[in-house]
Amino acid sequence: GRPLIVRRPGLAREGRAVCCGIPLPPPQGRLRIPVLVDWAAVRSVEAPPPLARCLEVAPESWQASLRALLAACATGDGAEPAVVGSLAWQWLTGLEYLREDSDADLVFAVGSRRALSVLDEVLAPWADRTDPRLDVEIRLAGDRSVAWREWRAGPPWLLVKSTAGVELAERTRLLEDVEA
């Protein structure tokens, strides 16, 4: 079997199948192939791998920065980033997904306002770094996520992604939904 990424469940057919996809690596054209999979054929459903497990396939030029990020996370609130995107696909498949200009796509789950504040402090030194550039999603209550750079910019409305779809939400409402 091959790893696949699951799309939003709302696109599934009557709960019997799930819409998935697989991105091809750059040498194979970076095509994104959609696949409809019967749930009975799914062997396992896994969370994105933690960054610490994916370091072995990260480019040498990223190593010091990513190790420093892990150390900063350990001294912050202990939130460990999960890896998605090209780094995750390279780790999962052993194929060359990373390019010279790839970002490190990470997801941090936060369960409280304090954790959100600490995460922003931990990530602040990486706001302008490019070794690699961090593309961070902050996973809030439920399965909703916002882009860290957008959150950090402080707009009153934010783009929120979830398994149900994409919407604009008021920042104050998002904060109300995060435990104090």
Where are these regions (language model features)?
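Broad gene-expression machinery/nucleic-acid interaction feature
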Residues: 17-19, 101, 105, 133-135
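Active-site nucleotide-donor binding segment shared across nucleotidyl transfer reactions
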Residues: 70-104, 108-114, 123
